[in-house]
Amino acid sequence: MSDNPSSRAGPEVVPTPPPSPAAEAAVTALPAHGHRPPATGSALAKLALGALGVVYGDIGTSPLYALKECFTGHHGVQATPANVLGVLSLVFWAMTFVVTFKYLSFVMRADNRGEGGILALLALVGKHEVRRSGKQLLIILGLFGAALLYGDGVITPAISVLGAVEGLSVAAPALEHWVVPVTVGILALLFFIQRRGTAAVGAVFGPVMLVWFLCIAILGVRGILFDATILQAVLPTHAVAFFARNSWHGFLVLGGVVLVITGGEALYADMGHFGKRPIRFAWLLVAMPALMLNYMGQGAILLHDPQAARNPFYLLVPGWALYPMIAVATAAAIVASQALISGAFSLTRQAVQLGYSPRVTIRHTSSTEIGQIYVPEVNALLGAATIALVLGFKSSSNLAAAYGIAVTGTMAITTLLFHRVARDLWRWPRWRAWPLTLLFLLVDLAFFGANIVKVEEGGWFPLAAAAFVFTLLSTWKRGREGLADLMRGAGLPLDVFLEDIARRKPQRVPGTAVFMTGNTGTVPPVLLHHLKHNKVLHERVVLTSIMSEEIPSVRDAERVTVKELGSGFIQVIARYGFMETPDVPAMFASLPHRKLDGPRIELKPMETTYYLGRETLLPTGPSKMARWRKRLFIIMSRNAQTASAFFGLPPNRVVEMGAQLQL
């Protein structure tokens, strides 16, 4: 119901205030979402198995296409014995340095109350950067890194499933024309079933990936038996000799080598789900040994037969096992794709809660796992873009050119944010922080440089996708800040309003009115409009603010603050982390059972009315945003999920009142 029919066309604005000071202390306070007691024994094994299914799907399916790209890609080298040993040496040391040394040993230590990922890292370091210019640079870098991850979420399902299904052309060349249609069918089904959630099949992800890793390890051992001299590739001298021999061409091959470490960022992003120890355990005990055995096996096949470079993975498989292996590879590719899709959903929720994205529909698909969510808007965009990529690029080799830029760009940005954590939070001296940062950047930028030359061959896609997403995220952030400043400047101080109410004593009616507001120090405009037009107030007025904290989750004991304001007014402040979804009715229902310092509140649903403001925005105000950005912000606002739906308010108990605002 609405008191202003014209308001239906405009966006609702419930301003998101800056994170409260509580976020400062919470970063180093007691553990919440991500921190857990160190897992041991069977618990460690179960978490490690789960990590195999979620964390290592992307990097685990890289053998399908990575080595092939190094020798047959746009910048591939001839599969001579010296080049094979050189490339395999680069593969071994890339995995060892980037994944084991950089991410597992250092980056995973930079957690936001146990949560990892680039937005969690941005939230952590942003509040500790005192210089405005430095903070703006961090935000730009973090947002662009997050934008690149969306591109990764589109490319990974496409290249993984394509790489798996391409085994058909090895098993039966006559089936080659079926590769793209089968891939499109699998991807369409995968995105279609997202709405039902993955709880039913999620339990098999870990076992599927364990079977996959065992299979590729066995295949690798089989290949090594052809020519065990491939094991010499662990010597770094072969990598050095490779660069000396191939010079610039050798540098460009890094664009293919980087494919063996795609998914490295997932180790960090999924840290909050499994913990550091299970992720490290799964990598060192299962994933890395299996991957290295398989890459060495592919290298041995290439030493034995250089013509195998056209598809060294499937040519490592004996003829009788080709079709079963295609099935296992496809299952593994689906698991890898699911992990990236779920990651995009989670990233979107973080962006919404941190104020970088409009409200979107977030549906929980599991009654037991809070992290299992479905975001229809993101699913539709990812699905359409992924299928379009398959139809446009048609092969994993063509897609490989597009893949590396998103991955290496994100890795370089993570390194820069890690440096701020080391300097500002850990108080590392310059002599300790800078050498490590420069070493990480040297490797990251080498990989990025080798990929940036592939812009015309497909690298344009992740850059274009990232630029598009970055524009949306940054526009929304700037628009929300400008809108909050506008409303804060025009707002009536709450204490002045309460003094006026105590003096004028307006007529009161039975029941409770809940007014949603983003600013705890001023009166919600919708309350002023209500009092001006209706001339009455409810017996009890609850001013409710939902605060988004820059931490993954808020401890239950710190969730709600209640304060008696006098004259029948009560202020309720509820805090949520960026991994949580606010539910206002559930929050109110929990109040009678909480130990609070303020007054006891018990709302009767049928006697409670929720009041929301719905503002029509015009791009003609004093904001310093460019006019095109204002128009884009207004379009995004109009298409955002309604505040009543996002906060879980009962539709038949909501009153919306509208006004015009010039941005």
From Swiss-Prot:
Q: Which reactions is this enzyme annotated as catalysing?
A: K(+)(in) + H(+)(in) = K(+)(out) + H(+)(out)
Q: Where is this region: Disordered?
A: 1-23
Select a single GO molecular function from the record's annotations and give it.
potassium ion transmembrane transporter activity
Which keywords are on file for this protein? Answer: Cell inner membrane, Cell membrane, Ion transport, Membrane, Potassium, Potassium transport, Symport, Transmembrane, Transmembrane helix, Transport
Membrane topology, as annotated, equals: Multi-pass membrane protein
Q: Does the keyword Zinc-finger apply?
A: no
Q: What cellular component GO annotations does this protein have?
A: plasma membrane
Compartmental location = Cell inner membrane
Indicate the transmembrane segments per the record: 81-101, 137-157, 173-193, 201-221, 224-244, 248-268, 283-303, 315-335, 373-393, 399-419, 433-453, 455-475
Q: Which PANTHER family is this protein grouped with?
A: LOW AFFINITY POTASSIUM TRANSPORT SYSTEM PROTEIN KUP, OSMOTIC STRESS POTASSIUM TRANSPORTER
The UniProt entry, under HAMAP family, shows: Kup (MF_01522)
Task: Write out the function statement from the record.
Answer: Transport of potassium into the cell. Likely operates as a K(+):H(+) symporter.
Q: Know the name of this protein?
A: Probable potassium transport system protein Kup
**Native species of this protein?**
Anaeromyxobacter sp. (strain Fw109-5)
Provide the organism lineage as a comma list: Bacteria, Pseudomonadati, Myxococcota, Myxococcia, Myxococcales
Q: Which gene encodes it?
A: kup
